[in-house]
Amino acid sequence: MQPERLIVFSRYPEPGKTKTRLASALGVEGAARLQREMAEHALSRARALAAERPVGLEVHYEGGSAGRMAEWLGPGLAYHRQVGGDLGARMENAFAEALRTGEEKVVLVGTDCPGITTTILRSAFNLLASFDLVLGPARDGGYYLIGLRNRVPHLFRSIPWGTAEVATRTLELATGLGLRAVTVDLLVDVDHPEDLPVWEREAGQTGELGPPRMSVVIPTLNEEEHLEATLESVTREPDIEVIVVDGGSSDRTAELALARGARLLTTTAQRARQMNAGAAAASAPVLLFLHGDTRLPPGFSGRALELLAGRGTAAGAFRLAVAGPGWGLRAIEGLANARSRLLHLPYGDQALFVTAELFRRAGGFPDL
């Protein structure tokens, strides 16, 4: 028995019974061939992960038989027919069986998102050391990956499968159950003819993308009004990992974060704990902590990285500018900027940045 298990959900590529929504563009034979290629693509990522860590690999299939699946995908895998009615029941049963036999971390992935990488799979297993639920959201509102370390049957029930609410509803249920949840990369799934360029682009990539230069951590609680503008200011720069740590918002904060491609964590509504949780999940060498109602200036990442590379610079922040007219706001700006310049005591609104190594050595933010 291995402590980690990776389950790949797939379907035997039988013409006329798979990828039917793509048949109008590819024909039934072409749609089946695409299903075959996408499953092989996803499985190659899974096998690459198994080559570097002791992960048990399983394929849970629909259509065909275990023998036909083995002829297609080869030996060295455990093949199981999917059991249950709807997708939720089939996933619930797969997790129940895996966790019943003693696995400590179980990740289940589909094969519809060609952007899946070994890095994402590795990250999912690593995050399960600190979180109860890991979710890989898809652009259409569903998810391509889910990871658990305990049985949580309610996560697969009362879900409107096949709608744009699947991922957000799952995260809402997780919050209600008191689970610590985190998302990995937002990916695009290939279900319709207009999605085919995504497959063509991803299938042509032979290497993995490099790591992000900076992780921006945004603690939130009901920030629907401001969050979209905040995320727009962050995501216009390349190689930035965006992590929204939500404290249980009752508005559309989580939905907006996912729509913008941010990773989403859920935890208790306490700012220091939220920022520490985001820092723990971050993968970049530099951390930037940003309030949900604050916008960053153009070129923020380059300037921050340049300053941190300088001798004697441990951390930094930006000048404060408050939106709106009036001498009172200008006075607040002036006092805040003077305080940070002269006393080296910036406010959180000024977007604090620091190397991840130094932040972790310092023990993070105090739990006040």
Q: Predicted regions span which residues?
A:
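Acidic donor-binding/catalytic loop of UDP-sugar-dependent glycosyltransferases
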Residues: 111-126, 252, 272, 292-306
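A recurrent flexible, glycine/aromatic-enriched loop bordering the glycosyltransferase active site
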Residues: 133-140, 315-325, 336-361
